[in-house]
């Protein structure tokens, strides 16, 4: 016992020293600015900090590639599918078409005897359509429904403690005695909905799968996640490959689709290699039920800065699994399609909310770095502090008073994006990933300021993405973007003022013209390819019935 405690202390000290040393090393490399390659007049340079970031991308991609190879090799052996599984669907003001497609995909799941529990966040007349769709698709004679005036933590109007206890027991009994059931309950947020399903199921099943009501599951999705959990008893949770259902509806949803592929099949695949996936996404995840009930109350009652948390439910659920020392994995063999915002403002609000949960959960995550591979500490430091270094770099370049610095920055952003997307195209075997380089512009212009705004308002939970039946537009997300653009515009004006006071040399003019032409040609080429792709694939997908998950 004392030996284990001593080893734990050593691991805590070791991971802390590693993390601090890594951060100090990166900061020193950034401040010193040592250059390996440097041309006359500083038209091009490549330094220590740039070399470190390039090495990170290469190493991350290598481990992702190795994890994909491991998925193909280790999971070919069939296993017995004799464990019980329950699928929990969280629904809130869902678009009727998406909900119907979700439930139709649930009926096609190939895992034997899977139990389906859908909990609707809201019990008003406006929410009844979701229950009607559930009964229609799942079969009125094969499913049960119940309108609950309460939820497990709040009483409805006119309820007493005794009647609330009785109704809670009734809901639990309904869930346990029916293979398919839909419950409408008093509004309380997604975490409340998930808690109802977890609490009512109790320990009656071996594995619990989570799913959102806008998600279409591949028939084999449950089977493939069970395989991962069955293969290693120390894996506590597993997530699958989330793809975009409405990718051709707008430029935002299209860029999100390529970003999703990169996030899951490069970043999370790399994390999976070391058993430390930091977020099992809500649309497609599975957990060991025995673990779930070790922390479900702590998960529900999570507080941050004195307030109960109302977002970041899936990330904190993953964090709780990691806190127990269990591994979290990703499998590309389990797939689903899910909806993503098609309007810029709704996307921005979604990203800000996700960024809030990321930075909040980063702090929780740091408490159990010592329980996992050093890669978990390494990646948390890199991804957590990268936005700050990037903002410092952008402001520095824009306010140096040299127009070439601004142009070089724009070219570098696209070049790095193009290199990364080219590798992804090879790994995926699909040229569409080349558009990932366009996402870098969206990241620099919108996501970067959204991350800073998320930190500044991390304890504010009053807004985010809305239900899909009624889209609510929130303009608050434009505040950080407007401030960011004002800062950049100030740098451009300052640069123009400084450059106007000194004549351009012939070599400088040549470099600027060549750089501008390269940048313009890049955009013309990518935008042309985008128009061609949308015209070709968008029409083909329009009105198509999704019988299975497609990777297009």
Curated annotation (Swiss-Prot):
Key words of the record: Cell membrane, Chromosomal rearrangement, Endoplasmic reticulum, Glycoprotein, Glycosyltransferase, Golgi apparatus, Isopeptide bond, Lysosome, Membrane, Phosphoprotein, Transferase, Transmembrane, Transmembrane helix, Ubl conjugation
GO biological process: atrioventricular canal development; bone morphogenesis; cellular response to fluid shear stress; cellular response to interleukin-1; cellular response to platelet-derived growth factor stimulus; cellular response to tumor necrosis factor; endocardial cushion to mesenchymal transition; estrous cycle
SUPFAM superfamilies: Nucleotide-diphospho-sugar transferases
Effect on the protein upon substituting residue 110 to A: Completely abolishes hyaluronan synthase activity. Not detected in cytoplasmic vesicles nor at cell membrane. Inability to travel from ER to Golgi. Unresponsive to AMPK-mediated inactivation
Disulfide-bond pairs as recorded: none
Tissues in which the UniProt entry reports expression: Expressed in fibroblasts.
Residues with the Phosphothreonine modification: 110, 328
Chain residue numbers at which the record places covalent cross-link Glycyl lysine isopeptide (Lys-Gly) (interchain with G-Cter in ubiquitin): 190
Keyword Kinase: no
A Pfam family matched in the record: Chitin_synth_2
Ranges that cross the membrane: 12-32, 46-66, 375-395, 403-423, 430-450, 476-496, 511-531
Broad class of where this protein is predominantly found: membrane
Presence of the UniProt keyword Transferase in the record: yes
Catalytic activity: [hyaluronan](n) + UDP-N-acetyl-alpha-D-glucosamine = N-acetyl-beta-D-glucosaminyl-(1->4)-[hyaluronan](n) + UDP + H(+); N-acetyl-beta-D-glucosaminyl-(1->4)-[hyaluronan](n) + UDP-alpha-D-glucuronate = [hyaluronan](n+1) + UDP + H(+)
EC top class, as a word: transferase
GO CC entries: cytoplasmic vesicle; endoplasmic reticulum membrane; extracellular vesicle; Golgi apparatus; Golgi membrane; lysosome; plasma membrane; plasma membrane raft
Membrane topology: Multi-pass membrane protein
Pathway: Glycan biosynthesis; hyaluronan biosynthesis
Activity control note: Regulated by several post-translational modifications such as ubiquitination/deubiquitination, phosphorylation and O-GlcNAcylation. The enzymatic activity depends on the availability of UDP-GlcUA and UDP-GlcNAc.
Entry comment on modification after translation: Phosphorylation at Thr-328 is essential for hyaluronan synthase activity. Phosphorylation at Thr-110 is required for transport from ER to Golgi.
Spans within the Extracellular topological domain: 33-45, 396-402, 451-475, 532-552
Function: Catalyzes the addition of GlcNAc or GlcUA monosaccharides to the nascent hyaluronan polymer. Therefore, it is essential to hyaluronan synthesis a major component of most extracellular matrices that has a structural role in tissues architectures and regulates cell adhesion, migration and differentiation. This is one of three isoenzymes responsible for cellular hyaluronan synthesis and it is particularly responsible for the synthesis of high molecular mass hyaluronan.
Disorder: A chromosomal aberration involving HAS2 may be a cause of lipoblastomas, which are benign tumors resulting from transformation of adipocytes, usually diagnosed in children. 8q12.1 to 8q24.1 intrachromosomal rearrangement with PLAG1.
PANTHER family on file: HYALURONAN SYNTHASE, HYALURONAN SYNTHASE 2
Subunit (UniProt): Homodimer; dimerization promotes enzymatic activity. Forms heterodimer with HAS3. Forms heterodimer with HAS1.
Protein name: Hyaluronan synthase 2
Organism of origin: Homo sapiens
Gene name of the encoded protein: HAS2
